Regions:
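Rossmann-fold dinucleotide-binding core
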Residues: 4-86
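Helical "substrate-binding/catalytic lid" subdomain
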Residues: 57, 77-174
Length: 175
């Protein structure tokens, strides 16, 4: 069983699965979410696409890496789920940046705004992650560099185009 944790396009995952199958090998696309902290703590979310029997065999190992390991469907489904996750990450990251820019321009301390948002309906994981980075302007030490998100949003943009979907917020976030 080959397990791939890359975030790539769905076609790449399916091509890898087909090539592996020709060699008699199972391939699971199993992208992860949760960052370095999730990896260190064994709390990653792992979204898996592929054969159910192969998933059941690999689960013993995947379960040591992640607290939330789910078979999403056939080959490509794990990758698709990761892209869906990244769609929300991208949009929420842009929304948080704009919210904190507005707070700053209104004379509101970023940390105070973040403290209130964490107990309000406007809360999001990305807002909570972005607040200290924005407050200190320490963008170099972000756990997930913008270039990774930019790559993922580009894949999402291409997928939406290929599927004939109009994902306006995704397109605006990518810009």
């Amino acid at each position: 069983i080959v397990v791939d944790h890359s975030t790539v396009d769905i076609a790449t995952s399916r091509t890898c699965a087909e090539a592996a199958e020709l060699k008699g090998v199972h391939f699971l696309d199993a992208p992860i979410s949760g960052g370095p902290g999730g990896a260190a703590g064994g709390t990653l979310a792992i979204m898996v696409g592929g054969n159910e029997d192969a998933f059941e065999t690999a689960y013993e190992y995947l379960g040591k890496m992640g607290a939330n390991v789910k078979l999403m469907g056939p080959s490509g489904a794990g990758t698709a789920m990761k892209l869906i996750n990244q769609l929300l990450v991208g949009i929420n990251t842009v929304a948080a940046a704009e919210a904190f820019a507005l707070a700053n321009s209104a004379g509101i301390d970023i940390t105070a705004a973040a403290d209130l948002l964490t107990v309000s309906w406007g809360n999001s994981v990305m807002a909570a992650r972005s607040a200290p980075i924005t407050a200190t302007r320490d963008f170099a030490n972000s756990a997930a560099p913008v270039r990774n998100l930019d790559k993922d949003m580009g894949i999402i943009k291409d997928l939406a185009r290929d599927e004939g979907l109009s994902l306006e917020l995704a397109l605006k976030s990518y810009e």
